[in-house]
Amino acid sequence: MIKKRNTTKISVIGAGSVGATTAYALMLSGVATEIVLVDVNKSKTEGEAMDLSHGADFVKPVNILSGDYKDTEGSDIVVITAGAAQKVGETRLQLINKNINIFKSIIPQVVKYNKDAILLVVSNPVDVLSYVTYKLSGFPKERVIGSGTVLDTSRLKHEIGKRYKIDPRNVNTYIMGEHGDSEIATWSVTNIQNIKIDEYANKENLEYNDNFRKEVYENVKNAAYEVINRKGATFYAIALAVTRIVKAILGDEKTILPVSTLVENYYGIKDVYLGMPCIVGGSGIEKALSIDLNKTEASKLVKSAETLKNTLNNASCL
């Protein structure tokens, strides 16, 4: 449990596009009194910290530093964004061997100085690397969280909201499973302000059929690839997603977010990290919710878990 105190320290490991933008989003949110940036490229890290610090007059008081792992000591949350970036045409799972090796050097250093921190993994493939972090750190599963499908779920809400011309925040739904190509949309539990989506569409004379679901799902699944093809990387939306998770932890909100967590017995799925609706609070993941899926969704979720397990088993550097 995050203890109530006058200061809140967040460390961000990796000062690339995602890490730096995450630090910026955290700074704007006002959730931390200290943000520490760590990266192998020390010059860039110093530059990012300087640039952010120059905006001190426009946000709540926050001390932004660049440093080494020792400077992260006593962090409440350590956000891990370090790793090789996803290239055009490259899947998240193809990043695995590069990033596992990077994590083997990062995680022991993080743990050395942060025995009580909550670790929030953002680097891709996030589900696999969350599991790797869980194993390398020796931390309880509650304190090793992946950003999971929080961003994918926002993308799904955005797609539905855009088509139905409603506020995406009024759409209740989840993307579950891998943050990647095998993720699933939980149409069977999707609703618009507690009205089932099929009933809402029928009542409002809106499209809701197999073609609608396929188009929306494909747009969500391929969203990152589309962004990468156009601008080379995704970082704004994921930074906001990370900030949302951090706020839930620091505020002990006990809110439900589809983060990546260790699944132990859900539709027969065990010993793998997946994006699942979880209660997130001051202890990290307080409970994973076993929502009822239809047979098709459950089958796809099992396949998603198998995809991730096979990737882990085939990783040459484990």
Curated annotation (Swiss-Prot):
Assembly and interaction partners: Homotetramer.
Gene Ontology terms: biological process: glycolytic process; lactate metabolic process; pyruvate metabolic process
Catalytic activity: (S)-lactate + NAD(+) = pyruvate + NADH + H(+)
PANTHER family: L-2-HYDROXYCARBOXYLATE DEHYDROGENASE (NAD(P)(+)), L-LACTATE DEHYDROGENASE
Domain of life: Bacteria
Swiss-Prot/TrEMBL keywords: Cytoplasm, NAD, Oxidoreductase, Phosphoprotein
GO molecular function annotations of the record: L-lactate dehydrogenase activity
Known EC number: 1.1.1.27
Name under which the protein is recorded: L-lactate dehydrogenase
Compartmental location: Cytoplasm
Family named by the database record: Belongs to the LDH/MDH superfamily. LDH family.
Its biological purpose: Catalyzes the conversion of lactate to pyruvate.
Active-site residues per Swiss-Prot or TrEMBL entry: 179
Biological source species: Clostridium botulinum (strain Hall / ATCC 3502 / NCTC 13319 / Type A)
Entry binding sites for substrate: 86, 92, 124-127, 152-155, 234
InterPro entries: L-lactate/malate_DH (IPR001557), L-lactate_DH (IPR011304), L-lactate_DH_AS (IPR018177), Lactate/malate_DH_C (IPR022383), Lactate/malate_DH_N (IPR001236), Lactate_DH/Glyco_Ohase_4_C (IPR015955), NAD(P)-bd_dom_sf (IPR036291)
Binding site for NAD(+): 18, 39, 44, 69, 83-84, 105, 122-124, 147
Gene that encodes the chain: ldh
One GO term describing the cellular component: cytoplasm
Pathway(s) where this gene product acts: Fermentation; pyruvate fermentation to lactate; (S)-lactate from pyruvate: step 1/1
